[in-house]
Structure formats: C-alpha cells, structure tokens
Swiss-Prot record:
Gene responsible for this protein: soh1
Signal peptide from the UniProt entry: none
Protein name per UniProt: Mediator of RNA polymerase II transcription subunit 31
Keywords, sorted A to Z: Activator, Nucleus, Transcription, Transcription regulation
Start and end residues of each stretch annotated as Disordered: 1-28
Family, similarity comment: Belongs to the Mediator complex subunit 31 family.
Provenance organism: Neurospora crassa (strain ATCC 24698 / 74-OR23-1A / CBS 708.71 / DSM 1257 / FGSC 987)
C-alpha cells in the first residue's frame, strides 16, 4: 500500500508540494497528501491527542515514529507558514522525536501540564498583542 500517504514507506518520500506550486497531487478521499499531513501535524499540537496516540500504542510503533520524523519538514519554509498554531504544534513534534517523551505522554499529569502551558502561552500572547487601554 505504498500509495497511502501515511504508509510505512512515507518516511522515505519527499514532502508534498505546497498549494500553488503547480504540482498535480493525487487525492485521497478527496484531499491531497499536503492537506492530510497538515491536518495531522496540527493535531499534534493537542496534548490530549498525544495522550490518545500513546494509549493506542502508536508512539511505540517504529513505522509511526519514522512517520513523525518525516513530518519534521513542517518546521521549515515553505511549509511552516501553513500551520495555524506553530508554537505548540512544532514544540510537540520536536518532543515526539524523543523516546522518553513518547513514553511519558501517557501520564495525565504531563498532559495537564502541557495543556495549561499552552493556555498560558495563548493568554500571554493575547496580552502582549492587544494590551488593555485602561
């Protein structure tokens, strides 16, 4: 099943062409590989989703770990600009490269800490970007 965008062999593939590059990407269920991989990599910004992946034992699957390594292309231009929340998304993608983190994310305490850190970062960013006039 080498044509599957998330197959074991996907880690050896080149990243998909970004929109507007003129490349004619095949569709999988109506979506391009670019769209599917963008949706998935953005989901990695959610600590609860990472915990779900760990509970399903995906974070100990060598093929899945290779896929996470492959997805690091999202941290570089021209792909970076398409990520809605690059801070938590890329932080978690980087952390997922570490075996210890992949093991530890099963802990509800770590999930809650990451969730609270993300909320605090969002609040701090909002305060810096839109200071009150009072």
């Amino acid at each position: 099943m080498a044509s599957d965008p998330m197959s074991v062999n996907s880690s050896a593939r080149e990243p998909p062409a970004p929109p507007g590059s003129g490349a004619d990407e095949p569709k999988y269920g109506g979506y391009t590989r670019f769209e599917l991989e963008l949706e998935f990599v953005q989901a990695l910004g959610n600590p609860l989703y990472l915990n779900h992946l760990a509970s399903r034992k995906l974070l100990s699957n060598p093929a899945f770990i290779a896929y996470l390594d492959y997805l690091q292309y999202w941290s570089r231009p021209p792909y970076l600009k398409y990520i809605t929340y690059p801070g938590p998304t890329l932080k978690n993608l980087e952390l997922l490269q570490q075996e210890k983190f992949r093991q530890d994310i099963i802990s509800p305490d770590l999930v809650e800490r990451l969730r609270l850190e993300g909320m605090k970062a969002g609040i701090d960013w909002h305060r810096e970007s839109f200071p009150s006039t009072a």
